[in-house]
């Protein structure tokens, strides 16, 4: 029986390109974990959610399906998906605590915040399960994760634009997400070239559209964040800077 491809298995043999893919997997695993911990910290500190409802609920739905319902198809992550599920659960708890501060101007949603988050999470979980049933859990793991990543990157941009300020956001949250995304994409390309984990989805034009779009969102985010921060500079400091110019 062929030994599963793991960090230990690869590094027991001669160093090769697949060893690099394992290192990138570790980078992505740590990076996403830092991203989630950073969201908990920033949301609690600023008393406002650090992530939108759609990306958060989609992430939890995907993680639940592949951590508990189809664990064999996330086994190459060696339990990391379960860790992410618990970290995201912590993000959800903090988000529910501080969401009233963000939805104060929407009375109907304000009164039903808990129900809304639970309902949307169940819907995304059902959708992830349906996708796995439709195209198989192996591809469903990748495409369901692609949706999570698209919503996470686009949601960060949308959150800045809709709020008009940087509360609830930080360079750390962005950097951890961006480096994890980039490392994950390179890992998938390496594994695709070596036919590991059965990743035929990189042959899809839609997949490359998704990759380019997500990377573009993550590349644009720090510039938008920096622009927002300039507008948040206290008036006296801003006027002093203008006079110096």
Swiss-Prot record:
Origin, by domain of life? Eukaryota
Q: Which UniProt keywords apply?
A: Lyase, Membrane, Transmembrane, Transmembrane helix
Q: How does it sit in the membrane?
A: Multi-pass membrane protein
Q: Does the keyword Transferase apply?
A: no
UniProt key word Electron transport: no
Q: E.C. number, please?
A: 4.2.3.-
Q: What is its main location?
A: membrane
User: One MF term in GO for this entry?
Assistant: lyase activity
**Its GO biological process terms?**
terpenoid biosynthetic process
Q: Where is the signal peptide?
A: none
Identify the pathway: Secondary metabolite biosynthesis; terpenoid biosynthesis
Tell me where the transmembrane regions lie: 17-37, 51-71, 76-96, 113-133, 138-158, 170-190, 206-226
Q: Where in the cell is it found?
A: Membrane
Give GO cellular component annotations, separated by semicolons. Answer: membrane
List the Pfam families: Pyr4-TMTC
Entry-linked InterPro entries: PaxB-like (IPR039020)
User: In UniProt terms, what function does this protein have?
Assistant: Terpene cyclase; part of the gene cluster A that mediates the biosynthesis of the fungal meroterpenoid acetoxydehydroaustin. The first step of the pathway is the synthesis of 3,5-dimethylorsellinic acid by the polyketide synthase ausA. 3,5-dimethylorsellinic acid is then prenylated by the polyprenyl transferase ausN. Further epoxidation by the FAD-dependent monooxygenase ausM and cyclization by the probable terpene cyclase ausL lead to the formation of protoaustinoid A.
What more the UniProt record tells us is: In A.calidoustus, the austinoid gene cluster lies on a contiguous DNA region, while clusters from E.nidulans and P.brasilianum are split in their respective genomes. Genetic rearrangements provoked variability among the clusters and E.nidulans produces the least number of austionoid derivatives with the end products austinol and dehydroaustinol, while P.brasilianum can produce until acetoxydehydroaustin, and A.calidoustus produces the highest number of identified derivatives.
Family in the record: Belongs to the paxB family.
Q: What is the recorded name of this protein?
A: Terpene cyclase ausL
Q: Which organism is it from?
A: Penicillium brasilianum
Q: Quick one: which gene encodes this?
A: ausL
